Amino acid sequence: MRIKARIGVENSLTDVQQALKQQGHEVVTLNSEQDAQGCDCCVVTGQDSNMMGIADASIKGSVITAHGLTTDDICQQVESRT
């Protein structure tokens, strides 16, 4: 299966990581700002509005805030943004 996109996902969002892997995305766990580099899109919890500085232009793709969204909602947003 061809990798669709490289998605950075905050460490605590394990259900989102699994769902995106099943859809064929390469998933990178975000532990620091450097992990976001090279990602097409990042998913963060939204508990810290600027988690690890990712809201600054450290990635070229979009940042999706998972707060209040289901895993399916997040996967749909990733699909529409990558």
Curated annotation (Swiss-Prot):
<protein>
    <recommendedName>
        <fullName>UPF0180 protein BA_1413/GBAA_1413/BAS1304</fullName>
    </recommendedName>
</protein>
<dbReference type="InterPro" id="IPR005370">
    <property type="entry name" value="UPF0180"/>
</dbReference>
<comment type="similarity">
    <text>Belongs to the UPF0180 family.</text>
</comment>
<dbReference type="Pfam" id="PF03698">
    <property type="entry name" value="UPF0180"/>
</dbReference>
